[in-house]
């Protein structure tokens, strides 16, 4: 059986790799290929297009990159025609993957969409398009599954994949030793995003905040887990321009999260990961003014951060656009560093978010759906 994956971002690479590993447990002979990154490659997926070449995040940025996406879709269509996969697994990246799903449908290839478009948040009309082109939606939120059912899509709630992935592998003492963390130091985690554009937009501000925090605390450490879509040298160039000693880490991010006091995170999957590790977080979100303005008109949710959307209220503070300044960041971080009760209170609310996400096993359930759909096509 042949399985084609399409993931366009670091988080999608992570989730696709988990499914690929689970598929190998079901059938070690499965042939997997597609668009992705290093984690998918390690999981045994032949990478036909490396996602390092992607990385736009807003409407304006997407418009500028349209010619590249048209060429990529044409290239992947040729790959499909040559490889003849039994199923296409689209993972997140809806602006591109929706178009690729239409191509697969045209070629008679079943499509499973995992981490599907957020029709519950915006662009609900996509529900009709998904019903037309997608064979099965593997939904990660219960309220999301209900939204898809309203459009008569074939959807199955599988649970959230992070429940299978997010957990420490070391004790706190072991993690402190591994990362060179001082027990008494205040420890801040910096997660500026997985796309170069996010990093360009947010890391400079994070580091300026770090400079102010260093003047307030004698013993403070900063850690930055490197997304595998960002070169280490690019991060080092940014960091060298500031008087902030940052430890760039390459692995064991969840072990790192359990020893940190506060996280500054770009909006996205990282905020749900920190929620599941019960790490107090300040969310930062900044895109072009045009992208933000259009987004405000079409998005129908009251929060940006996934933990807040799941909770139905603000659990972690959200700084948007012009509010993303060192002064405002420091004003929110300081109480979480100095007020033990405030820190504990946020951790308690994040624990509730964790509970609302359901039970582990999502990855295995998705792999079984992929395998069964692919086998049906394979046996035709």
PLM features: what roles do these ranges have?
Residues 1-380:
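Nucleotide-activated sugar donor-binding and catalytic core shared by glycosyltransferases
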């Amino acid at each position: 059986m042949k399985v084609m994956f399409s993931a366009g971002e670091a988080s999608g690479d992570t989730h696709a790799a988990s499914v690929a590993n689970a598929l190998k447990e079901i059938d070690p002979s499965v042939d997997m290929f597609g668009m992705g990154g290093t984690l998918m490659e390690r999981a045994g997926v032949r990478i036909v297009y490396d996602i390092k070449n992607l990385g736009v995040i807003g409407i304006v940025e997407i418009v500028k990159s349209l010619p590249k996406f048209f060429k990529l879709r044409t290239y992947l269509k040729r790959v499909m025609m040559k490889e003849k996969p039994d199923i296409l697994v689209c993972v997140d990246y809806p602006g591109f993957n929706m178009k690729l799903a239409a191509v697969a449908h045209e070629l008679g290839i079943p499509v499973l969409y995992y981490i599907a478009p957020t029709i519950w948040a915006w662009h609900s009309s996509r529900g009709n398009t998904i019903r037309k082109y997608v064979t099965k939606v593997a939904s990660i939120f219960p309220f999301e599954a209900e939204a898809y059912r309203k459009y008569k899509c074939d959807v199955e709630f599988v649970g959230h994949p992070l429940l299978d992935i997010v957990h420490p592998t070391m004790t706190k003492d072991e993690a402190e030793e591994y990362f060179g963390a001082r027990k008494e130091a205040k420890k801040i985690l910096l997660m500026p995003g997985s796309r170069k554009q996010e990093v360009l937009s947010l890391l400079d501000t994070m580091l300026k905040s770090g400079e102010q925090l260093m003047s307030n605390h004698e013993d403070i450490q900063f850690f930055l887990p490197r997304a595998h879509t960002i070169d280490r040298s690019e991060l080092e160039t940014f960091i060298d321009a500031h008087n902030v000693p940052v430890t760039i880490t390459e692995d064991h991010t969840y072990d790192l999260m359990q020893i940190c006091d506060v996280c500054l995170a770009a909006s996205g999957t990282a905020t749900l990961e920190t929620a599941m590790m019960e790490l107090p977080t300040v969310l930062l979100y900044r895109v072009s003014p045009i992208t933000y303005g259009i987004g405000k008109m079409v998005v129908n949710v009251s929060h940006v951060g996934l933990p807040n959307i799941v909770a139905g209220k603000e659990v972690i503070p959200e700084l948007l656009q012009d509010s993303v300044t060192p002064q405002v960041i420091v004003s929110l971080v300081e109480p979480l560093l100095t007020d033990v009760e405030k820190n504990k209170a946020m951790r308690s609310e994040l624990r509730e978010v964790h509970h609302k996400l359901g039970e582990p096993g999502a990855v295995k359930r998705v792999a079984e759906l992929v395998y069964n759909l692919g086998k049906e096509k394979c046996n035709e």
